[in-house]
UniProtKB/Swiss-Prot annotation:
It comes from the Bacteria. Its EC number is 2.1.1.174. Specifically methylates the guanine in position 1835 (m2G1835) of 23S rRNA. Its main location: cytoplasm. The gene is rlmG. It catalyses: guanosine(1835) in 23S rRNA + S-adenosyl-L-methionine = N(2)-methylguanosine(1835) in 23S rRNA + S-adenosyl-L-homocysteine + H(+). This is Ribosomal RNA large subunit methyltransferase G. It holds the Pfam family MTS. InterPro entries: DNA_methylase_N6_adenine_CS, rRNA_m2G-MeTrfase_RlmG, RsmC/RlmG, SAM-dependent_MTases_sf, Small_mtfrase_dom. It comes from Photobacterium profundum (strain SS9). Signal peptide: none annotated. Belongs to the methyltransferase superfamily. RlmG family. Keywords: Cytoplasm, Methyltransferase, rRNA processing, S-adenosyl-L-methionine, Transferase.
Amino acid sequence: MKPALTLHDRTLKLNRFPIRKIETLQAWDAADEYLINHTHDMELDPQRPILILNDSFGALSCWFAERANVTTVTDSFVAKQGCIANLTANQLPSVNIIDCLAELPKNPQLVLIKLPKNNRLLTWQLQQLCHLLPEDCRVIGAAKVKDIHTSTLKLCDKYLGETKTSLAVKKARLVFIKPNASLAKPMPEAKAWDVPEHGIRLSNHANVFSGESLDIGARLLLNHIPQDFKYKDIIDLGCGNGVIGIKAARRNPQAKITCVDESFMAAASCTENAKQNLEAPEQLTAIVTDCLADIEHSSADLVLCNPPFHQQTTITDHIAWQMFCDAKQVLRPKGELIVIGNRQLGYDDKLKRLFGNVEIIAQNDKFIVYQSVK
């Protein structure tokens, strides 16, 4: 793993977030390098903003921080913290960092987009830009070649403007989009659907995990959320749209429910869904943070967790391990962690090593629900 990005006689020290003792993954990729090289000789107006969308750990934000008026747009708390940490480590000026639901600055001169794999998020961002961009604004997307599909280009062409691609360099490609304001359409509402067997209706912003239907892991976990007056404080860790936390709130009306996610869109969806589905929405609070970093130790009786297995576009199991470790810290003595996981992931070994005990409380062909007690 290279800790430094060196281009054009300039070096940036860049780390992923959070920093781990042994790191095998870089904080930037070939698509970042391609964007930097392509824009190196561009003349930029220091007064007009440039927008950087989906900058994983701040490589692009750091590169342009001294050169332009930068606004970075991200749905990820982890990406935001990584960007801030890398700006600080390289003694660079701060940049404006906003989430995907915030209003974008007007009259940008350049938009750089790390193209997301999630087509719903890409569509949302393209439509948001189409309402905003002046005709002279240059828009350049970038991603690995394998992640730029015909469907990706069709979305760009449909929702923002005429789209062309570059040659591939180091297995990365650029996408050039000419803004066309006549394509502007009303911004789409959050996707809504029902979970009829539980009497829950869910609204999902564009980047919420499994935002078009209930994922099969959550469907199993919903049937095994415990009910007991001993639970005063319950955490839904990696809450997504909040369906697990909402079910826990209904089964345990005496409990305070804290839903946690690193996605700003997830937390917003969760808050909206609590208002839609709970008689006392104030019972549930949604917060955006990295796992349970901002939760007081020994403050919870029950943690419910459906861990992700990727960070940004990278598949990794360290997030699940971090979630389990954080859960142990925030649980009170005799507090319980209930986890749903694909049976191939082997969470039982991790939980046994960490808690000293693990029990299978439910399973089907694909998933297992585990319980460990502190």
